[in-house]
Amino acid sequence: MRLRKKWWARPELEASPIFKSLDEARELKGNWKDEFKNNNDIYLELGCGRGGFAVQAASKFNDKNLISIDLKDEVLVYALKNIVDAELENVRLVAMNIGMIAEIFDENEISRIYINFCNPWPKDRHNKRRLTHTRFLTEYKKFIKPGTEIHFKTDDLDLFNDSLVYFEESGFELLYKTYDLHNSDYADENLMTEYETKFKEKGIKSKFLIAKLK
């Protein structure tokens, strides 16, 4: 569903120190720890939507920093509100196309990546747009630390199975996988996204994996 343009969203985002434009994020490349004013590990969420997962993750891992990315101001403005309401200081939001992600991070700057329910791009000619495709994994390897884990969730079976191949081809070790996350031994650790809650209510199984950079 196409989002209705909210002309007030960008000014509201820019008024908050939590939000960074693409230009500001580029200037922070290699210096994100200065932005957070600590040396804690930095986790990255690719596609944060309205921020439900970000709030949970930043609260649970309050000794880590989290950078959450999304393209649309119209969703980021709601993520900002949720983060502010939760009084979290260890989160930053960036508005950008994830295809440019290597422009804002330096080598060894990220310690974990979350990819939750991204666009499955089912047509063969669009597969390279998948956030787990080898093309993207190659970009992530430019700025993640050795041993970094990528946590990936999807409701799409074809995307999940293809992603298993992408990770293997890109030099990642598969640590965990399940085709039914909510009935798995990882269920208690799982942090639910907005989409995931809706899928669960409809009986749609979530697939989940953890892959580690060797």
UniProtKB/Swiss-Prot annotation:
This is tRNA (guanine-N(7)-)-methyltransferase. GO terms for cellular component: tRNA methyltransferase complex. Substrate binds at K123, D155, T193, E194, Y195, E196. PANTHER family: 3-DEOXY-D-MANNO-OCTULOSONIC-ACID TRANSFERASE/TRNA GUANINE-N 7 - -METHYLTRANSFERASE, PENTACOTRIPEPTIDE-REPEAT REGION OF PRORP DOMAIN-CONTAINING PROTEIN. It catalyses: guanosine(46) in tRNA + S-adenosyl-L-methionine = N(7)-methylguanosine(46) in tRNA + S-adenosyl-L-homocysteine. Keywords: Methyltransferase, S-adenosyl-L-methionine, Transferase, tRNA processing. Its EC number is 2.1.1.33. Disulfide bonds: none annotated. S-adenosyl-L-methionine binds at E45, D70, N97, N119. Residues 125-130 are annotated as: Interaction with RNA. One of its GO terms (molecular function) is tRNA (guanine(46)-N7)-methyltransferase activity. SUPFAM superfamilies: S-adenosyl-L-methionine-dependent methyltransferases (SSF53335). Pathway: tRNA modification; N(7)-methylguanine-tRNA biosynthesis.
